[in-house]
């Protein structure tokens, strides 16, 4: 096995030597087999070299043959492999006449390696060691045709001084040689090949920058009847020190591409990188396989599919036919025992594709690196004829291609009559296209999804969801859900959609836009705002909620039709400011470009400049009747309440009892001997409790007034009885009489609240609202007058109705105002009558509130007294029965007395004994006066 490296200085030579020595041992003339190619080691590829060089284990040795690879300075471009044994046996290869530096020399002029060479040679400055020596260089005659079978090779050896080292001058190449065991090969002869002999396959002087010495040439015939590249430009595509020579027409070979020697892809197919295919599985036509996909050796791929990148397949596959329209891509290590190949015109092979050195490629096919696959072509695609040779005036050589995963295609060669098909365009960086879908039918899940999609009707309205926990009935037991499936109930779907569906409202026919209406009549997309956009949107929401057109609104303003209060309130609420109204009226642009609210306001104000003033007056007209009626009712209630409080009655008796009780309790203090008290103290009577905490001052006062009124009622009753000659109460005891007085007085005091009905109503009137209502009515009447004054000479139906309303409202409001002044004076007098200084308070209706609360407290006290009285009546029969058993001589009449006391009196009417009470109260007041 032989490798050729460009001379690259002592440092690079030392690195090359260390790499070759570490990976390839030649001690004893025996080469250790690489585990990658036949050993038992790992199948992983060797780590990339930091200098970009390729090493022996990256290539397979063919029995009886030597592979020679030329690598440039950066290790990018691989030229080709060659069977050198046939050339050596035929005498067409001349051995190196000038062995490099020191070392054993054989009789044939070649440097010996392995056991014949010292293994511990560590000279860094010497290139010639056990694994590196100078090689020959071959060159094809420029006159030799690429398709001729008798191509010759000439040897070019730079014998001159000039450039040496660093890859810049000299142009010499070196090869590493090693002995390897022979393997059977179908393409090699039985004769053994001297493995120490090295051969070169490219001209070093063509790459150098400064070698100017004499060159010796010898012609050689290319093996297999093929031809070698005609210039270094064909075998070197990157990193050269000088511009490469022009390529032959239609050819392009990228660096680092070594082709398998026996894999002949059929026309129309290709294979992606790092993929070695099985020995008996040809891909069907129209398919391709990418690298790194582990394929079986006999599994055919269905149409439209391909394996993924870097498939690790069998490495001993025979020729794998590829259909037409496909090609073999990057870094694909194929089988190593195939027939020689030559590259016809119109084809090129970009870099990094490990292909066979003698695999014929039909026209129309090419090999690319890191490029997406081309679309498959027909199975029996015929190759186009090769292009004619270039004319005498050849174009200048193209610039060297940039370093990258793939080199661009060369420019089309000039032809005289006709040119071949142009090279394909550069592949995109997005990678190969996705494989076509499986031609088989849909899967089960796909069928399910399709079935579900068929049941969904896009026009069916969507209903509101019902959030529940879905359950599956248990088939192992009987459940209620098993009986529901076969039920006969069916709901009304239309009704359910109407109630729970999200159905878009269709516009009415009157508001719908005709189909033949032009786009210019509709609202433009770019709207113009006179008002603030946010304010305009808010007004538009209100206007749309009314459901009225601008014509209906204008008709309402001009004719004065009756409208609902809510509608007029919304229209009056969106009134713009005077400045905004001026801007809207002065707008001289296209009204159709205005926003919805701005456009509607523009048309309304243009038709009726005082539109929103009319809305306010019309709203006042509608609400005037209810507001005036409420105000009149409040005035009547206040007047009646004042009259109730000024009448002398039971309320005076209660105040008298409270005053006397307070003076008795405050005797000897500054608060005692009072002549009057503030009525706010009435609310505090229930807070003063007795010593035993069983009663309050309020209960005591009310009970005393009840007893007093009951006694008065009993006296009046006795007077009437004495006139009739009956004396029913003469035989009653004092205790029984007290109970009788309380029973007769409770209905009298309990009916006090009914005598102050208007007082309790007046307490519910808010003083601020009462005053503000009258002021608001007067203000709106003035606004109506102002509107009518501004509209003089502009009479319409609406203004006529407003004038009639104004005349009646103005007169009525004057009467209400005067009545209100009179009643408020009455309220002030009543307040001063009960408590002096109360006029300083802000709320003049506070007196009514205090008395209402006190009357409620009195009613509660009466209820408590009646409850206690019933308890005493229930305990009295038991005591009487015990007394009767101890004194049996008691008369039946006395024993029957407890039964008489157990009788419950009926509830008396509210005004019972009112006349007698009034008479007695009047007599008392007269005596006091």
UniProtKB/Swiss-Prot annotation:
Segments of skewed composition (Basic residues): 12-22, 92-103
Renumbered residue ranges of the record's region Disordered: 1-50, 90-470, 868-929
Biased composition (Gly residues): 159-172
InterPro entries referenced in this protein's UniProt entry, alphabetically: FH2_Formin, FH2_Formin_sf, Formin-like_plant
Alphabetized Pfam families for the sequence: FH2
Disulfide bond residue pairs: none
One GO MF term attached to the UniProt entry: actin filament binding
Positions with biased composition (Low complexity): 173-205, 914-929
Domain spans labelled FH2: 453-884
Basic and acidic residues biased stretches: 23-37, 104-115
Start-end of Pro residues biased regions: 372-439
PROSITE patterns, alphabetized: FH2
Polar residues biased stretches: 253-262, 355-370, 871-890
Ranges of compositional bias, category Acidic residues: 116-133
GO biological process: actin nucleation
Similarity comment: family membership: Belongs to the formin-like family. Class-I subfamily.
Protein role: Might be involved in the organization and polarity of the actin cytoskeleton.
Protein name from the UniProt record: Formin-like protein 7
Source species: Arabidopsis thaliana
Organism lineage: Eukaryota, Viridiplantae, Streptophyta, Embryophyta, Tracheophyta
């Amino acid at each position: 096995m032989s490798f050729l490296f460009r001379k690259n200085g002592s440092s690079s030579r030392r690195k090359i030597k260390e790499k070759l020595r570490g990976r390839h041992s030649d001690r004893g003339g025996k080469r250790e087999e690489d585990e990658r190619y036949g050993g038992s080691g790992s199948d992983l590829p060797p780590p990339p070299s930091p200098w970009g060089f390729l090493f022996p284990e990256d290539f397979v040795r063919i029995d009886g043959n030597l592979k020679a690879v030329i690598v440039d300075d950066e290790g990018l471009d691989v030229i080709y492999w060659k069977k050198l044994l046939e050339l050596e046996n035929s005498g067409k290869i001349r051995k190196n006449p000038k062995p490099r530096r020191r070392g054993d020399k054989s009789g044939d002029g070649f440097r010996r390696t392995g056991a014949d060479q010292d293994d511990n040679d560590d000279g860094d400055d010497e290139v010639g060691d056990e694994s590196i020596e100078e090689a020959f260089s071959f060159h094809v005659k420029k006159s030799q045709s690429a398709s001729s079978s008798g191509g010759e090779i000439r040897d070019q050896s730079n014998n001159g001084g000039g450039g040496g080292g660093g890859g810049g001058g000299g142009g010499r190449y070196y090869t590493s040689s090693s002995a390897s065991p022979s393997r059977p090969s179908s393409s090699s002869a039985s004769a053994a090949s001297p493995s120490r002999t090295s051969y070169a396959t490219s001209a070093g002087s063509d790459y150098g920058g400064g070698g100017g010495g004499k060159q010796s040439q010898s012609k050689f015939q290319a093996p297999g009847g093929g031809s070698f590249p005609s210039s270094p430009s064909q075998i070197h595509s990157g990193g050269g020190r000088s511009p490469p020579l022009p390529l032959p027409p239609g050819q392009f070979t990228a660096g680092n591409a070594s082709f398998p020697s026996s894999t002949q892809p059929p026309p129309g197919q290709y294979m992606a990188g790092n993929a070695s295919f099985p020995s008996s599985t040809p891909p069907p036509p129209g398919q391709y396989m990418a690298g790194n996909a582990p394929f079986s050796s006999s599994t055919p791929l269905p149409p439209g599919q391909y394996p993924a990148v870097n498939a690790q397949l069998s490495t001993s596959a025979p020729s794998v036919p590829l259909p037409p329209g496909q090609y073999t891509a990057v870094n694909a290590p194929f089988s190593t025992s195939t027939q020689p190949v030559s590259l016809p015109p119109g084809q090129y092979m970009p870099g990094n594709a490990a292909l066979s050195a003698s695999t014929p490629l039909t026209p129309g096919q090419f090999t690319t690196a890191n490029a997406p696959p081309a679309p498959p072509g027909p199975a029996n695609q015929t190759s186009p004829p090769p292009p004619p040779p270039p004319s005498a005036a050849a174009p200048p050589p193209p610039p060297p291609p940039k370093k990258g995963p793939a080199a661009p295609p060369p420019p089309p060669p000039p032809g005289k009559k006709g040119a071949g098909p142009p090279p394909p365009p550069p592949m995109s960086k997005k990678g190969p296209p996705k494989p076509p879908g499986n031609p088989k039918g849909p899967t089960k899940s796909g069928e399910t999804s399709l079935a579900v999609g068929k049941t969904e009707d896009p026009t069916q309205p969507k209903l509101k969801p019902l959030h529940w926990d879905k359950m599956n009935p248990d088939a192992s037991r009987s459940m209620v859900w098993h009986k529901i499936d076969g039920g006969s109930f069916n709901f009304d779907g239309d009704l359910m959609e109407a109630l729970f569906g999200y159905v878009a409202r269709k516009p009415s026919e009157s508001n719908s836009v005709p189909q033949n209406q032009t786009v210019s009549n509709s609202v433009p997309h770019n709207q113009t705002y006179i008002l603030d956009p946010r304010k305009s949107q808010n007004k538009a929401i209100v206007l749309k909620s009314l459901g009225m057109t601008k014509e209906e609104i204008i008709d309402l303003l001009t004719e004065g039709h009756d409208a609902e209060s809510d509608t007029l309130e919304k229209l009056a609420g969106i009134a713009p400011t005077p400045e905004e109204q001026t801007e809207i009226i002065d707008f001289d642009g296209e009204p159709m470009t205005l926003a919805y609210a701005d456009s509607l306001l523009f048309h309304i104000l243009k038709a009726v400049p005082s539109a929103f003033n009319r809305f306010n007056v019309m709203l006042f007209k509608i609400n005037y009747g209810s507001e005036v009626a409420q105000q009149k009712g409040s005035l009547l209630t206040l007047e009646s309440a004042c009259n109730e409080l000024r009448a002398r009655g039971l309320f005076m008796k209660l105040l008298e009892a409270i005053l006397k009780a307070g003076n008795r309790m405050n005797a000897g203090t500054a608060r005692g001997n009072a002549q009057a008290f503030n009525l706010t103290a009435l609310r505090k009577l229930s807070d003063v409790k007795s010593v035993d905490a069983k009663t309050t001052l309020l209960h005591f006062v009310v009970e005393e007034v009840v007893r007093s009124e009951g006694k008065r009622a009993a006296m009046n009753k006795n007077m009437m009885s004495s006139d009739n000659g009956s004396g029913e109460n003469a035989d009653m005891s004092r205790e029984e009489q007290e109970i009788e007085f309380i029973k007769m007085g409770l209905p009298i005091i309990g009916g006090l609240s009914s005598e102050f009905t208007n007082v309790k109503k007046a307490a519910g009137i808010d003083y601020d609202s009462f005053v503000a209502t009258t002021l608001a009515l007067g203000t709106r009447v003035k606004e109506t007058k102002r509107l009518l004054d501004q509209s003089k000479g502009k009479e319409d139906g609406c203004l006529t109705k407003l004038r009639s309303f104004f005349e009646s409202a103005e007169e009525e409001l004057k009467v209400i105002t005067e009545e209100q002044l009179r009643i408020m004076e009455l309220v002030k007098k009543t307040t001063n009558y009960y408590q002096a200084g109360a006029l300083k308070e802000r709320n003049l209706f506070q007196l009514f509130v205090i008395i209402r609360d006190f009357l409620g407290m009195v009613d509660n006290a009466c209820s408590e007294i009646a409850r206690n009285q019933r308890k005493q009546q229930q305990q009295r029969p038991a005591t009487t029965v015990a007394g009767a058993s101890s004194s049996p001589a008691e008369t039946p009449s006395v024993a029957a007395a407890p039964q008489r006391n157990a009788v419950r009196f009926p509830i008396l009417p509210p005004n019972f004994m009112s006349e007698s009470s009034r008479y007695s109260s009047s007599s008392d007041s007269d005596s006091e006066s």
